[in-house]
Amino acid sequence: HMPWSIRALEAGKHVLCEKPLAMNAAEVRQGIEVQKQIGKLFMEASWNRWHPRTIRLNEIVKSGAIGEVKKIRTAFTYTDLDPANIRAIYELGGGGLYDLGPYSVAAPLWLMNFAPTSDIKTEVKWHAGGSDETLKVNFKIGGVEAEAITSMATADTLYFEVTGTKGSVAMGGNDAFNSHNKPSTLEIDIEGKKSVENFEACDPYQLMADSFSNKIRGRESWLMPLSESLKFAEFFDEVFKVMGRP
């Protein structure tokens, strides 16, 4: 994605780029330098960050309602991937970490304000195309235990759960990272008092695109900064090292 994004920037275009923004942190740094020189908007399209449910989960955690965060669990898996699909070819950016990691693996990072990470451990099953077919990453972030799962070869499983000293909050249903145009829920448990918050159907892709276009027009709107994309890429580089990939 990055080489074409750079070409578009150099052609004077604002760029909303499909995730992952790049194959590694070095490429992201290159893109950041080009963006600074050109002055056009450049953002990684992590649409789930605009979903009202995601925003609300973040608010609940940051408010301290569930107490001090102790554990974060995420998963984004699906099955029946065609072996010839580009998503399975490592050299072309394939694999669960590249394809699904920007959702499930990145979530603990932004939720914990990119606190220092440590103790990265991985369990991986390799695809015939050379990519990571199924991956579990366990790590600590700011002292919080985190577990993130990605897979292109297991039953559809999507969750985002945060547990604290006073309770927990979790995305209801089986759609934590693929809720498009349908109602969704948050399940909250604070000191034994359980509740459910409901969210109307929405198109988070449109919300993201609207935010990007509003910024182009000079209107106030939130964009995910490239500094966050760089931190994601740096962490993914570390995960790849532990996995045994280049």
Go through each PLM region and give its residues.
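Short polybasic amphipathic segments
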Residues: 160, 178-191
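Structured catalytic cores of enzymes that bind and process phosphorylated ligands/cofactors
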Residues: 4-5, 9, 80-111, 117, ...
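Beta-strand-loop-alpha-helix segment that lines the small-molecule cofactor/substrate pocket
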Residues: 2-49
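Predominantly a Rossmann-like dinucleotide-binding segment in NAD(P)-dependent oxidoreductases
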Residues: 41, 48-121, 126-127
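C-terminal helix-rich "cap/oligomerization" subdomain common to oxidoreductases
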Residues: 29, 211-246
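Active-site loop of classical SDR/Rossmann-like NAD(P)-dependent oxidoreductases
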Residues: 179, 196-210, 224
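Contiguous beta-strand/loop segments that form the cofactor/metal-binding neighborhood of enzyme cores
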Residues: 105-178, 210-219
